[in-house]
Structure formats: structure tokens, C-alpha cells
Amino acid sequence: MKFNYKNICLAALAACSVTACDLDTAPTTSLEANAVFKNLENADRVIRGAWNYIFNSGSTYASIGYGAIMINDDFAGSDVVRTTSYGYSSSYKLTNGYGRGEINDVMWDMVYDPINNCNAVLKNIDGISGDQEEKNRIKGQAYATRGFLYMLLASHYSFAIDKDPDAVCVPIYTEPTDYDMATTGKPAASVSEVYEQALKDLKWGYDLIPTDYNRGSNATDQYKIDHIVVTGLMARTSLYARKWEDAYKYADEAMKLKNNYLMSEAEYKSGFNNALNKEWMWGYSCTLDDNLPAYNFYYKDTTTPGGGYTNFNTDPHFKELFDKNDYRRDLFKWGLNTGYGECAMLNYKFLFADINNMLGDVIMMRVSEMYLIKAEAAAHLAGKTSEAQALLKELRDARMKEGFESPVVTATGDELLKEIWLERRKELWGEGFSLTDIIRNQQSVDRKKYEEYAMADITHDSKGQEIRTPKLDENGDVILAPEDATDEYKEQNCMLISGHSTLKFPDDSDFEANSKYYLFRITEKEELQNKNLYNDHPKLSIYR
């Protein structure tokens, strides 16, 4: 990776040339700000350049952009099982953050480089002549992008805001970084201050981006932040910051802007690869000329023939959490992954749109998240318990097979919150929320051993090598060996199937809440270069 990019140059903020892909950029360190910001089109290109970096930066194929952060966060949670292959071992074993692994360091640059882009836009755009509404839109998107990035930092580099609002988090930069600042650095702010900055930026974006701004119907434009997206980000960030009234208000508004649309069963089972899906609020679409972010599907798609690493599999205990008539349950089945032929509970939720051309869109926000945010916020607000229950049931009903209805929700208080958190795990599985939810709710990773003998279909490949595949019943569930099966019977007719392989923290201690192994960690380079880092707030005791 390049320099730690709160850093020295105008570099990636600068020369973006729009060619085959709207996000194509050609960074240079030699361009001065007055040359870059001579018109609104160039300012807009700087924002597009920031998003290019967010989606495409990384150090290896196992750390490509924001999609890799989302994969990391789910591997570090309770419900994704990593099978043997390249990539994300440290994420699954929970050594990435505390041990300063690859994803940990990539995240730092992935966030602070674009923040510097946004700061440059905000410093210079008022001096550019042009249409005021267009200027407001670009300025609003710069604020919203920066707010989104500070939300990412606040939710990954510190424990929950209510655990210790004054705990150290990360530095806040709101001006372009010059040489002096890059070589000295700013003190790290507290987690509450970082959330405050995120919300302030997002509110500016909310106020400035015109409500009638239309990013168009092209899939490749769906990453652009419009009024719906910034409203959703206000809801998400308010939830993380435990501002329940705001979370409720903005989630409700976002739902209405999308007509409360929830996917049909057919749409839900279509592969989560299309940014034009009517429930999606925000997504990134790859093209033939810009498909690097879709490389992440080589991990997440475990079933398409010709797949790559196929290691993003499912905890068998997780499937048991679904109602028998919940169609989401159908997305998790035992089988042999297509990359390595390893037996696992595969996921059918994420599929390449076109594996031959490495195409598939990245989901970043959809309406069901807004339902869950509104329900969780309502559960915290006086007099809104029944509304929280109704919202939870409405979402569950939308995920039931035709002709079936979910049970009435009767839980209240903490039990209702637990049901909502569980529904987040079920509905948003694989979409990058696991680790953040564990941190912000002060919960623990929950992984249990799973090991059973299943009946096997036995075939042979062209070389005569035996292949055993778990037998499934008509409901897609594995057929287990008889309870009285002898060892000889199992050897002849069965196969051993298993779930999680990592069941404790790296130091062999049991999983618990508020562990140092959940957090991302300020990079060693930053600690060495930034002499002011801990001037205002002391280093977390877990690192001392």
C-alpha cells in the first residue's frame, strides 16, 4: 500500500478521468488544488475518485475495498463458517484487529484517503462558479461520504458508545492534510466525538443533496449517494450512536421513500447481485472494465460451478433459527463447495451474476435494514413497544412462503430487543453487520460445536476417487445416520459433517462481550508517526 493517506499529497483526490467506468481515476501527486477545482465537473470527479478508492483499494485479492471489510465482519461473527482455502483466516480466527492483520491495515488507508478527498472538495467547492443546486449536490455528497467513513471508524475502532463515551477512537480530520499535518498528526478523538462528527456530516449531506436528485437507472450509478441513501445512513448511524428518536425518524422516512418495499421470494433467491433490485437502496455495480470489487464473490458464492475460494459457508446451528416455512431457510444446504469440494453447509444467498466475466453487484443498504432499525429504535422508545412488535412481524411475514404467516410477536423489553437482534442476523446474513452488531450491543460471538454423521451419496470421479455427498431430504435438510449406527455402518454409508472450527479466542479463552479481539486497531505506522495520537484520550487499556 501507499503512504498512510491522511497524508501528504493531493494524490488520489485529484485527476479523475471518466472513461469506460464512471469511477475510473488516474491519481497524481503533481496536480495543484486550483487546477483540480477549476470547475464542478472536476469536483464531482474527486468524489467519484474517493469511491473508486473505497471499492478498489487493497493489498491482495483477499482485501479488496469495502466489500472485504464486510466479509471480514461476517467471518468474525457467529454465523459464517470458513472452510479451508485462501483468504480471511485471520478474520475468522479473530486475529485481524488485535494482531493488526491485512484487513486491519487496509481499512485505515481505505477510509482516510477518501476522507482527504472529501476535505479537499469541501475546502474548495464554494470558490467554484456554477449551478448552485449542482454545487449543493456535490458538497452534500462529500459531507455524506465523509460521514459514512467516520461512522465506519467509530463502529470498528472502539467499543459501544454507551460502554465508555470518552474512550479513545481515531483522529478526526476536516481539512485537507498538508505536509506538516501529515508528519505530526492530530490527536485521536473519543468514540462519542467521532459519532458526533459522522452525524454532523451526514446531516449536512441530508440538507444539501436535493430531494429530487436522481442518480438515474443505470446500475453503475447506484453507488452515488442520493437523498434516500443519506436518509438511510442517518438512520444507521443514529442507531449505532444510540440516538433512538433520530434512528426511528430517519428509518421511517427511508422506508416511505422506498414505499416500504420488501423483496419477493423469487427476488430474495436471485443471488443478491443486482443493484437495480427494487429493495436495494445503495449498491455498487461492476462492469467488464471495472470488476475488481466483484472478486469478493469468489469467497461468498459457494455453489456456482467454476467458483474460486468458496469459503463463506454457514453455521448449521444458524439454519435451525429459521421457521420451517421461512423461505430464507432454503438458502442454506449441505453440499460440496465448488472450489475445493469440501463438505459444508453452503450458502445460496450470494451468487455471481456472471462468473465467466466476474460480475456481481455489492449490496450496501436495503429496505429491510430500515425495518429493523425502526423496530429496534421503537423498542427503546416509550409507548412504541407494540409498533416494534408489528414491524418485526411485518418483516417476518414477508419472508414466509406463500400461504404461511409468522407467529404474533409478544416479547417486550430486553426479550424483544433480543428477537430484533436475532432477526438482523437472519435477514442481513452475509451483508457485513455481524461484527458491528456484536460490538455496539455488547454481545459475544456465539459459536457452538457441530459434528454429526450424515447419510452419504457415494460416487466416483473419472480417476476412480470416491466422492461422498450428504443426502438431503425433500426439505433440503441433511439425513443423519441412524442413532444406533455402528462404526462399520458409518464407514460404509456415511460421512462426518461439521460446522465451526474456531470455537475460542486466539488466546484459547472463551468468547465474551467487549473483547479486544473484536476491535480494529490503529495501525503501527500511525502510532509511530503520530506523536499527538494519545494526547487527548489515553490508549485503551487492552493495548497497554
Language-model features, listed with the residues they occupy:
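Membrane-proximal, proline-rich intrinsically disordered regions
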Residues: 3, 20-70, 322, 403-404, ...
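Inward-facing hydrophobic residues that define packing positions of alpha-helical scaffold repeats
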Residues: 47, 115-118, 195, 202, ...
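Conserved, well-structured interaction surfaces
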Residues: 85-157, 189-192, 206-211, 357-362, ...
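Hydrophobic-face positions in mid-chain alpha helices that act as interaction patches
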Residues: 224, 248-367, 401-407, 413, ...
